[in-house]
Amino acid sequence: MRKTIAYFHLPGLFEAYAFYRVFLPLFFEHREYFYDWCAIGSLHGAPADCIWGGGRVGSGEWSAQEVLALTRAYGLSARLTFSNSLLRPEHLSDGRCNALCRAFARSDGPQNGVIVHSDLLLDYLKANYPQLSFISSTTKVLTNFRQLRQELERADFSAVVPDFRLNKAFDDLRALPQPLKDKTEFLCNECCSFGCRERRACYEAVSRKNLGEQAEHICTAPGASAGYRFSSAMENPGFLSVGAIRNVYLPMGFSNFKLEGRGLGSAMLLEFLLYYLTKPAYRLRVREAIYLDAMLDLF
């Protein structure tokens, strides 16, 4: 079933809250600046000091009440990124993480959710916060399509984010029944080396760091020392371009697309949204509305 709207799931719910306070009014009040086939489905992230966190170390000191008020105002779902893969039973009673889940579960408006890796945590959340939806994290590094399909078939999850190396498995993707296509949420802008064999180890190091354990991990994959560069992500074999989303994935029946980058700065986040959401003729206007004025000095 061909889809007509691409729903983007954006990074930085807590980490880039100040940015979204400016960007979201612009997006919803000036829809002529943005592609009419694009919509925002959710914002995801986690504040600092969350032991359930994973994927990236969370940041941002904004309260749950502040971020939820923002997402409610624009009819968006808010997702907690709680994808720590190394949780133990004693971690489930953590007061900070439970308080966040309570706030998200009780919030009015669209259903909020949790991005999760650990089945231990998933079972706990299902029992204690059934109002939330649950999204299977890409940190599981499911690079075998059979594994991905099994994950999509799990009734526990409203969405599954595949490993980016399955983004171009077109024959298998086309063969999915529509209900499973509707649950598939592609990671569009991954910069990690396509052939990296350390991805799982990298995520585990972040999980340990969130637990307060020493877990320094130096990635040796090609290009890792340069950090995240959007230009490099665009050259990645797993990259999903605007043209591919509109002309390949929507016609195939897929409609959910995730952007990574909650640990990056707001300047990089803006570049993502200019590329994926904004019509080229209006990109300068969006920059001017966000930060650009005649007195700005770069050096």
Regions found by a protein language model. Give the residues of each.
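Active-site pocket-lining/capping segments in soluble small-molecule metabolic enzymes
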Residues: 1-147, 151, 157-299
